[in-house]
């Protein structure tokens, strides 16, 4: 995915405010052996790009003043209540160095699983992304989680899924194996009141009939 930017010569709070007022977004590019570079981008183009899933988990071609470089989106700040991108950070990547990146999970085949079709189970997505490590060329836009064989009362764990070639999970604890999704039967609804007639309540002051001796 291509991103167009221009080098920014003026910095500071006032300069950034004027930049935003002119329809631009300030940003920075850092990493590798090159010095950090402050940039500016067209706000509307950036705003729409941020709505695309691939923009967050892919290697991007950042073109600055006509020169392209490979980068990852590392951070961005939004206005608290306006649809306004305040700032964005990109990190340069090297083709020979592995990157750590959080990639989205795409869940498939839930509707065709026996747990859902035959037992009426409900599938819950516990996680929506995973952190992986790989070379930039191997970075997937997403990781697929196949739910076809999920069983009621059980879950699909991170180590259960097949990752693309060259991609490994980043687990911060060796024994870590988080649940990605599980299947459960919904709780039975409370029983509805029966329609059987009930005896009328006794009138105030009325005595209950006595048994005959």
From Swiss-Prot:
Gene Ontology annotations for the cellular component aspect, listed alphabetically: cytosolic large ribosomal subunit
InterPro entries the record matches: Rbsml_bL25/Gln-tRNA_synth_N (IPR020056), Ribosomal_bL25/Gln-tRNA_synth (IPR011035), Ribosomal_bL25_b-dom (IPR020057), Ribosomal_bL25_C (IPR037121), Ribosomal_bL25_long (IPR001021), Ribosomal_bL25_short (IPR020055), Ribosomal_L25_dom (IPR029751), Ribosomal_uL5_bac-type (IPR020930)
Pfam families cross-referenced by the UniProt entry: Ribosomal_L25p, Ribosomal_TL5_C
Disulphide bridges, residue numbers: none
GO molecular function, one term: 5S rRNA binding
Region (Disordered): 191-213
Bias kind Low complexity: ranges: 191-207
GO terms, biological process: translation
Superkingdom, taxonomy of origin: Bacteria
Record keywords: Ribonucleoprotein, Ribosomal protein, RNA-binding, rRNA-binding
Function: This is one of the proteins that binds to the 5S RNA in the ribosome where it forms part of the central protuberance.
Family stated for the protein in its record: Belongs to the bacterial ribosomal protein bL25 family. CTC subfamily.
Complex formation: Part of the 50S ribosomal subunit; part of the 5S rRNA/L5/L18/L25 subcomplex. Contacts the 5S rRNA. Binds to the 5S rRNA independently of L5 and L18.
UniProt protein name: Large ribosomal subunit protein bL25
Organism: Polynucleobacter asymbioticus (strain DSM 18221 / CIP 109841 / QLW-P1DMWA-1) (Polynucleobacter necessarius subsp. asymbioticus)
């Amino acid at each position: 995915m291509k991103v167009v930017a221009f080098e920014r010569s003026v910095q500071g709070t006032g300069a950034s405010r004027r930049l935003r007022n002119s329809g631009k977004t300030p940003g920075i590019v850092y990493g590798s052996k090159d010095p950090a570079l402050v940039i500016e981008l067209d706000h509307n183009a950036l705003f729409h790009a941020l709505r695309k899933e691939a923009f967050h988990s892919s290697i991007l071609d950042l073109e600055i003043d006509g020169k392209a470089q490979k980068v990852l989106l590392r951070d961005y700040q939004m206005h608290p209540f306006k649809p306004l991108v305040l700032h964005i950070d990109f990190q340069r990547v090297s083709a020979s160095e592995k990157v750590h990146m959080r990639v989205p999970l795409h869940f498939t085949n839930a509707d065709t699983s026996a747990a859902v079709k035959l037992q009426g189970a409900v599938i819950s997505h516990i996680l929506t992304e995973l952190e992986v490590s790989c070379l930039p060329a191997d970075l997937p836009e997403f990781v697929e989680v196949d739910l076809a064989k999920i069983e009621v009362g059980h879950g699909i764990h991170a180590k259960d899924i097949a990752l693309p070639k060259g991609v490994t999970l980043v687990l911060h604890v060796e024994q870590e194996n988080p649940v990605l999704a599980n299947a459960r039967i919904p709780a039975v609804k409370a029983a509805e009141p029966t329609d059987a007639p009930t005896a009328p309540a006794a009138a105030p002051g009325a005595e209950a009939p006595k048994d005959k001796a």
